[in-house]
């Protein structure tokens, strides 16, 4: 697995909280959910050899990790078999939805992959979860 820890100019999206750790997080994480994030850990571009990607991990899928979204987007557009970037986020508090419309606040540490667009407006603040529970929405991460 490879990592690009560089920060290149301004970014539309949050940067990795610790660029030195980009590429060190586990490949197997949760996927989606939680509604709020605390930290961006890295951006990931998953590459699929069965869809034309270079077989760097035999015929198994793999990802390249980035500290910044824009280089990840550029990479995903020029590499065969690559998906658009995902973002690995850390959550210390989040909202679980065990059943549609049933929202449960949770605390702990959770690492999950999100669609990059879910970052917009979903950085957790001291009151985010309480406000969400007053007026829940069924959309987003």
Predicted regions and their residues:
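Conserved NAD+-utilizing ADP-ribose enzyme module
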Residues: 1-61, 69-141
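Basic, glycine-/proline-tolerant helical and adjacent loop/strand elements
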Residues: 65
